Amino acid sequence: MSSTPKVLRGCCGIGLWALLLTPTWASWQDAVPGAQIIGTGDFSVFGFDVYNARLWSAARPLADGQPFALELIYRRSVSREDLVKASVDEIKRLAGSSISPAQLAVWQAQMQQSFVDVQAGTRITGVYLPGQGARFFVGQQLQHEINDPLFAQAFFNIWLDPRTRNPELRQQLLGTAKP
């Protein structure tokens, strides 16, 4: 008797387990149903384009308590370490002394797992889940989930807080920029 059917059963069983273990939020769009672009803008440093940002939400204008996604499409190479350092620096600047150094260290470790080295064309999407935390996707694949609502608020404040370093990009993302 041939062992092919047994091998096929084994492969099919593994495939079925993979499907069953795939989270229901396999893409960022699953976490933000009905998402539409609220706004888009470019971020540049010293005249060099770094990324194009897109803010997605089902609520327009963006509403408190609603999930949203911030999609960054990179236009140049940036290391994971540089992404994490820039994020930590901005969180620290915006939060001041309300975030302890120990908490920042925990968040820094979480961001190390959430981000990757990026090249031109790499797409990282952060999903804000009110009261839960954040999920980070590279392309359409979940990279890491952080179950910490305080982190999520502090992280997305980098772009959306009125004290952001780039108020023009904030207005573009929120769809409130004047033509």
Predicted features along the sequence, with ranges:
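Bacterial N-terminal signal peptides that target proteins for export
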Residues: S2-I14
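Bacterial N-terminal signal peptides
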Residues: C11-P23
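Terminal leader/tail segments of proteins
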Residues: W25-P179
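N-terminal compositionally biased, intrinsically disordered segments and leader/signal-like regions
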Residues: P5, P23-W25
